Design a protein with these regions (language model features):
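Glycine-rich anion/phosphate-binding loop at the beta-strand->alpha-helix junction
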Residues: 187, 415-416
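RNA/tRNA-interacting regions in translation and RNA-turnover enzymes
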Residues: 1-399, 403-410
Length: 427
């Protein structure tokens, strides 16, 4: 902005609206108001607008490969950054919070479909104090494009960003009998979600319900009939693991993808559900947002025992065209928090619970080769030409029959139509 002469008076500044500054409601409350933007606090003249609205942080825009669901979180990125910088990653220690009373006096959980919901963990908090979350939490949420709402909802979103595990908070008074039922939707059932839209659900979809009604679409969005409001006095925090393929099918039918659904689709570990819940309760206690009741309610049908795989390190070297000693492989894997040891002609690898991309069985050698290769450095691997036999292609009998049928129908006067495969069937 340069000094400008307006009506004979030199003006050295300008009063701007949030829109003129390129701000949205997620960046600063009231930024989308049609008029001059009003700051809610006193700020010294000459202060940078970035500092005044809390947008002075450094934001990293990171492109992830689809298989690394664990990196959709601050902690996941920190693990990778520590490995890249040669630093030891310090795993966050969650302070356990012991609640008073018995949670079963307030709530209960039953899971009817454990295949689609292998784990459902919940925690009751009463005597809620609903208020804006602290400035530091609001600032961090805005930095990642989330709009602060209140302390309880913000805690669930903060844990989502920090641990990469979606959470939800129900108004416990709106859950009939305090009983949560994880079940498939019924015929002709509808749910009004938090965005105010009535959505028709089908029996293939998983629903969070109480004995009377649906209170949320599992892994996608909570229901409007149980949302946290200023009048909420007790809440049930939910941290669950839902089957990614089912959530993907649900979002396609509903034509609606949320941040939570995107993470479930890529895969979340049942172990992480319990950690996320513990972190949320720790924040509730730190912010004095309510009274924690009893112990967690945990319905777990998943195998959460540590996963151990045996890897043929000679095969790893063959895949990479390298000659790395097994002892060096152990050291390389340790830099990315994957413990391992040499056992004869194998590497015995303890797979961290968050590394859902590392498979067991015949894929294990290839997955560990990928990890060893990126730590060793692909530039250090000697280039070689691809070797292999080529075969003459041929059209299969099924395709021949299909082409013959098409030719016959066209000869009879029919027209062949090619539809776009990426549009909804109704269009």
């Amino acid at each position: 902005i340069k000094p400008t002469n307006m009506r004979g008076v030199e003006s050295a500044g300008m009063l701007c609206s949030g829109k003129e500054l390129g701000l949205t409601e997620a960046d600063y409350p009231g930024a989308e108001f049609n008029g001059i933007m009003i700051l809610h606090e006193e700020h010294p003249l000459g202060q940078r607008i970035q500092d005044a609205v809390g947008m002075n942080d450094i934001i990293f825009d990171i492109e992830l490969t689809p298989n690394r669901a664990d990196c959709q979180s601050i902690i996941g990125i920190c693990r990778e950054a520590a490995a890249a910088l040669g630093q030891k990653f310090r795993e966050p220690v969650i302070r356990p919070v012991t609640g008073e009373g018995d949670a079963s006096d307030y709530a209960s959980v039953s899971v009817e479909n454990t295949e689609l919901c292998p784990r459902y963990s919940a925690r009751v908090v009463t005597d809620l104090v609903i208020e804006p979350s602290p400035k530091w939490m609001q600032r961090r949420l805005r930095a990642v494009g989330m709009r602060p709402i209140n302390n309880i909802v913000d805690i669930t979103n903060y844990v989502l960003v920090e641990y990469g595990h979606p959470m939800h908070a129900f108004d416990l008074a709106c859950v009939a009998q305090g009983h949560i039922i994880v079940r498939n939707a019924r015929e002709n059932e509808t749910v009004v979600t938090l965005d105010g839209k009535e959505r028709a659900v089908t029996p293939e979809m998983l629903l969070i319900a109480d004995p009377e009604k649906g209170v949320g679409i599992a892994g996608v969005m909570g229901g409007e009939n149980s949302e946290i409001t200023a009048a909420t006095k007790a809440t049930l925090f939910e941290a669950a693991a839902f089957k990614g393929s089912n959530i993907r099918a649900t979002t396609r039918k509903l034509r609606h993808v949320t941040d939570a659904a995107a993470r479930f689709i890529k895969g979340v570990e049942p172990v992480n559900a319990y950690l996320a819940l513990a972190r949320a309760i720790e924040l509730v206690d730190d912010l004095h947002a309510g009274k924690v009741i009893g112990e967690p309610i945990d319905v777990c049908a998943a195998d959460v025992s540590p996963r151990v795989i045996d890897v043929d390190y000679a095969h790893v070297n063959k895949i990479l065209n390298t000659d790395i000693t097994p002892e060096d492989m152990v050291k390389m894997l340790a830099t990315i928090n994957i413990p391992s040891e040499v056992c004869g002609d194998k590497l015995r690898v303890d797979v961290p619970h968050y590394r859902t991309d590392i498979e067991s069985g015949i894929e294990a050698d290839w997955d560990i080769a990928e990890e060893v290769g990126r730590i060793y450095g692909y530039d250090n691997i000697p280039p070689t030409l691809m070797r292999g036999n080529t075969f003459r292609g041929r059209i299969g009998d099924d395709l021949k029959d299909e082409d013959a049928m098409k030719d016959l129908l066209v000869a009879q006067g029919c027209c062949e139509m090619y539809n776009l495969s990426l549009i909804h069937i109704s269009e």
